[in-house]
């Protein structure tokens, strides 16, 4: 997916603004230590590092292009994600650890860009699809969104979450667990105001879990 618009930009994880191009999220080059420690390494890769597998895509650039098309307002994406993480790893209580925590690193990235955001798009939940974490997921999400709105000083901040997709080559327990997370996500709007949930269950996969690049474009436009 190519972004031809200079009005859609991204603040990449190596702390530079540039026209948004996938992959906009690249933890190996991140300056925040939490991102390399989660990968088990001691420092970031050079800024020009490329995934040797040539993979990496998300709905962010497609989403921003669609927002620009609909509103005419230039879009800026502040990239903070790290794949395969749990809500416990995003615990707002860890913000005191600054760039050594996912939540703290996210806050610092926003602060470096004026401290204000117009909203958040969120794609997480697969790593919490386990019997021991499913019972905690709803309350963890409620606390997370509440903390975000408090720390960004934006009580009504729009929060758009992706409902996790399906998975293949799995056992009955895993399928049940993913279904439980999807159902919690579907009903979160009853507990969190100004939260929207976007489905992904009907989109094609690139492997047993991950959406294809084509699906990410469709998802972003939704």
Region locations from a protein language model:
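Cell-envelope and extracellular/periplasmic
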Residues: 1-222
């Amino acid at each position: 997916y190519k972004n031809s618009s200079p009005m859609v930009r991204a603040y990449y994880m190596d702390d530079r603004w540039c026209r948004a191009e996938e992959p906009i999220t690249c933890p190996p080059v991140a300056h925040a230590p939490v991102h390399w420690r989660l990968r088990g390494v001691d420092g970031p890769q050079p800024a020009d590092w490329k995934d040797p597998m040539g993979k990496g895509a998300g709905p962010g650039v497609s989403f921003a292009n669609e927002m620009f098309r609909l509103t005419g307002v230039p879009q800026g994406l502040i990239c903070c994600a790290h794949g395969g993480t749990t809500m416990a790893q995003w615990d707002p209580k860890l913000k005191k650890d600054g760039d050594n925590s996912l939540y703290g690193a996210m806050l610092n990235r926003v602060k470096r860009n004026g401290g204000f955001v117009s909203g958040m798009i969120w794609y997480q939940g697969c790593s919490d699809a386990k019997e021991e974490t499913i019972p905690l997921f709803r309350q963890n999400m409620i606390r997370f969104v509440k903390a975000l709105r408090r720390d960004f000083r934006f009580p009504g901040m729009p929060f758009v979450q992706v409902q996790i997709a399906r998975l293949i080559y799995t056992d009955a327990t895993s399928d049940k667990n993913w279904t439980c997370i999807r159902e919690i996500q579907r009903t979160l709007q009853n507990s969190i105001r100004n939260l929207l949930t976007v489905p992904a269950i009907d989109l094609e996969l690139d492997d047993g879990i991950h959406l294809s690049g084509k699906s990410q474009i469709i998802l972003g436009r939704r």
